[in-house]
Amino acid sequence: MTVYFTDRDLGKRFPEILRAGGLTVERHGDHFAHDTPDDAWLEEVGNRGWIALTHDRRIRYKPNERDAVIRHGVPLLVVVGAAPFQDLAEAFVTTLPRVEEFLAGHKPPFIAKVYRPTPGETAKDRNAPGRVELWYPR
């Protein structure tokens, strides 16, 4: 069973929407203190074989966090977008088939970005999926 772990920066509503969409989700706050360093939770997520979700676009540039992703074999998906978390979560659920296809084709460790569909795509199809792009390693 695929388990998604949501970083604290995605709040409480994001994982609720994913759960309502049928995903198995573990929240940061259910396992760690608010001030737990990212490299510590990344280690645990990697050890458990979970898929990590974050909104932190800078994580790739933080050596200790990037190294934790690599060292602990973490599949990390960065949810990209300056939108309310509800919109980001709904777009993630809509994009899930592409996320699953990406996960099936890429062996951890990696960092990938998950994008919402463009406004033009959603104007044509309200349920248009977004896209997933490998970010690290290149």
Region spans (language model):
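Mid-chain, well-packed structural core segment of small domains
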Residues: 60-98
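A polyampholytic, Gly/Pro-enriched intrinsically disordered region
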Residues: 49-52, 96-107
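N-terminal first-folded block
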Residues: 5-48
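Small/polar loops that bind or transfer phosphate-bearing groups
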Residues: 6, 54, 80
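Charged phosphate-binding loop/patch that engages nucleotide di/tri-phosphates or the phosphate backbone
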Residues: 101-138
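Acidic, metal-binding active-site segment of PIN/NYN-like and related structure-specific nucleases
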Residues: 38, 49-64
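Short, acidic/turn-prone active-site loops that include or flank metal/cofactor-
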Residues: 28-35, 57-58, 80-84
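Catalytic phosphate/metal-binding cores of nucleic-acid and nucleotide-processing enzymes, i.e., regions
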Residues: 2, 20, 24-27, 47-48, ...
